[in-house]
Amino acid sequence: MEWSTLTTIFDTSLAVVFTWVAYKTGQIIWKYTPYSYPNARIRAMEARLLTDQRFSELAESKSLQNFVVSLEDTDYGKRLTSLQSYNIEDVERALDLSLVDVIELMVKIMPKRIKGLFEIMLEEWDVRNIINVVKAKLSNMPPQDFIMPAGKMLQKVKAMAEAKTMEEMLVILEGTDYEEPLRRLLLNEITLQEFELELYKVHYSKLLRYVNSRKGEEKIIASEFVNMLIDYTNISTLLRAKLSSLAQEDIRKLIIPGGTLSKSTIEAMINSEDVVMALGELEGTKYGEVLREVREAVESGNIESVEIALRKYILRRMKELSQFYPLSVAVAVAYLLQKESEVRKLKAIAKLIEDGVKPEKIKEMVGELA
């Protein structure tokens, strides 16, 4: 074989190798680089999460005003320092809005290919606001008092609050995913509880469609997260329905499509004799081990213990994924879950202080939350 031929073959081989290396390098850069800045920022935010010692100190607050002042040097300071008064409703709203601020930040800093997850998560506030406005209207209460300034449809929600009739509210929602449930409510085809459920079904279906349209690690992580949220909601709803002795057919209407639980497991829970038997049907699922620990609490009618155990499980799982995929959306989701837990604890402390509960009891009660 001539030397020129060998050179040509060698050059061609090198070109193929370099092209492959460039392609793989490009893939790695596309896959991981967009997460470098946001995840570094989130890790810094994680360092500012409140410690158990800080929660203990907050529980010692003599009043709501002391509680608020103690949080002024934290990430909650921005919202809390703007309060005009120190009543529990305003404090809770400020804490909720601090959580909204975090989700909005995720929308801004996360890669375009996954930011839609957080945009849809913000839409849950649209669902809450619409439900609150409708309930207020039907109860002849001022709907403006129940609107949280959050979500993507805030202007429509405010217009609904100003509407003089329910029919006007329906016109305002025309063309949205929430128009049909409200129409059915006005025609008395569904109850107010079913209307609320329909809106949440719309919300979770949006989340599912979005995560299922992702690729690679984003799909793996986001899909597991959303399906666990649906499992959490279905388990909580089903157990509470069982505790209230709701008819099996009525319970079936409450189940949100999706999740990791099989149809046979859901059906077995629905057909079970009581709430403890329903809980037992989860023994063979991934939630079986953590729920086994709260069986006694459920026997006494404490469904909140199940919800706490499930929230802890979901957070632990997302933390595991954030360690396995350090440059991924798992870091943001795990942080958001920690922030939700923190806000939940702060709201509980604030309410207990308002109710005059002793500090030691507050520490005990809040320590059990997640």
From Swiss-Prot:
It is a peripheral membrane protein. The keyword Iron-sulfur does not apply. It holds the Pfam family vATP-synt_AC39. It is found in: Cell membrane. Keywords: ATP synthesis, Cell membrane, Hydrogen ion transport, Ion transport, Membrane, Transport. GO terms for cellular component: plasma membrane; proton-transporting V-type ATPase, V0 domain. GO terms for molecular function: ATP binding; proton-transporting ATP synthase activity, rotational mechanism; proton-transporting ATPase activity, rotational mechanism. InterPro entries: ATPase_csu/dsu_sf, ATPase_V0-cplx_csu, ATPase_V0-cplx_csu/dsu, V-ATPase_V0D/AC39_subunit, V-type_ATPase_csu/dsu, V-type_ATPase_csu/dsu_dom_3. One of its GO terms (biological process) is proton motive force-driven plasma membrane ATP synthesis. Component of the A-type ATP synthase that produces ATP from ADP in the presence of a proton gradient across the membrane. Belongs to the V-ATPase V0D/AC39 subunit family. Has multiple subunits with at least A(3), B(3), C, D, E, F, H, I and proteolipid K(x). This is A-type ATP synthase subunit C. It comes from Pyrococcus abyssi (strain GE5 / Orsay).
